[in-house]
Amino acid sequence: VSIYNLIVEDGTPFRAMQEAGTLALPAEDTQAAIDALTREMTERYGYQRYEVSNYAKPGYECRHNYGYWSGIPYLGFGLGAASCFRGERWSNLRSFPQYLALDMASELRQGCPTLHAEHETQSVQDQMEEFMFLGLSRTAGISEVEFKTRFQVDIHSVFGERLQRYTDEGLLIHEGYRYRFSERGMDVSNFILSDFLLD
């Protein structure tokens, strides 16, 4: 089960309604009460939180989500498919007529310049930020050892001040070589996660 609070995006009908004063959104304390009720009800029926916004019965967690949030490389094939591999992230074009018109042999020889509608090369900093953002979004949190193995640098030399501050505030829990959100930290996770962007 995935449960999210509504985020009103620019350019959407909800944003227009909000600006016109016709969209009533719950106050922050009401949202917190809804979140608490959600946790209570999911636990009552045997669902456990395994990511910031996802709940499942033990053994039924979404494997796709787990792979994505764990930073496991993935390859997507076909119309609109997304991939992330060796610091490169790309997605295929979404237009079916354009997709059918491609000369795939030529595309593959040339590195897929038309097939890959979007392409991004991630810097090491981008990858570190993503490690923190995605890893902390899981209830298992992040591993200092995995960070060191992946980036060849100690996590505290990059994020030490932030990790210490949120641990001292009771928003992160540091156990062994892992950091994870406390229950209170989960409630304000969007704010905390944005602080792990290094720019």
Regions found by a protein language model. Give the residues of each.
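A short, conserved structural fragment
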Residues: 167-177
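Short, amphipathic alpha-helical interaction segments positioned at domain boundaries
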Residues: 184-199
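C-terminal scaffold of the Radical SAM
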Residues: 1-153
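Minor-groove-contacting beta-hairpin "wing" of winged helix-turn-helix DNA-binding domains
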Residues: 178-182
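Short amphipathic alpha-helical interaction segments
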Residues: 152-167
